[in-house]
Amino acid sequence: MTRSVNTPWTLGLTGGIGSGKSAAAQHFIDLGVHVIDADHAARWVVEPGRPALEQIARHFGQGVLQADGQLDRAALRKLIFEVPEQRRWLEALLHPLIAEEIVSHLARAESPYAILVSPLLIESGQSRMTQRILVIDVPQQLQIERTLQRDQISEQQVQAILQAQASREERLRHADDVLVNDRDHAWLRSEVERLHHFYLTLRGGQS
């Protein structure tokens, strides 16, 4: 794993849909850690007026745009999950642009270390921007239950998302640290605090 001279020591935080990545990331933010969310970067690169949005509209048609010119994410999601080749085309377009946004935001970090939160940390190659990987892990059935409750989508859509992401086993193979998030929020907070102190100690020994 490599690091740009202009970016801080960076922890990659990942996990499947419904694993609790966002909740864990918020606890790190509360502790003063600079966190960049790859999903946010993915939204920034397709804002109206950005070249990527124009290319997407040309490729998929105007049906992927809302009346106000914003990207219709639901329409696009349906298209790319139905046709894997379309998902690969979109990833080839967006992944380099998202990486540029991430590096730009990491360079502004002032905390002792930074965190890159990404559901596709392994699949997208974003792990190359990190020095250590923390996986938020939960049993798949709990992932499905949480996502159905949170997102108001069908179980078929949840299964399609799971299939598009790295498998639980693949994520765990890449993990330096694993947090099994199958308990309550108080426990998650305490585990994040424990890991935060560990990373501060670890970072203290890094150049």
Swiss-Prot record:
Keywords: ATP-binding, Coenzyme A biosynthesis, Cytoplasm, Kinase, Nucleotide-binding, Transferase. The lineage of its organism: Bacteria, Pseudomonadati, Pseudomonadota, Gammaproteobacteria, Pseudomonadales. Its main location: cytoplasm. GO terms for biological process: coenzyme A biosynthetic process. Belongs to the CoaE family. It comes from the Bacteria. Catalyzes the phosphorylation of the 3'-hydroxyl group of dephosphocoenzyme A to form coenzyme A. This is Dephospho-CoA kinase. ATP binds at residues 18-23. Its EC number is 2.7.1.24. Pathway: Cofactor biosynthesis; coenzyme A biosynthesis; CoA from (R)-pantothenate: step 5/5. The keyword tRNA processing does not apply. The keyword Metal-binding does not apply. InterPro entries: Depp_CoAkinase, P-loop_NTPase.
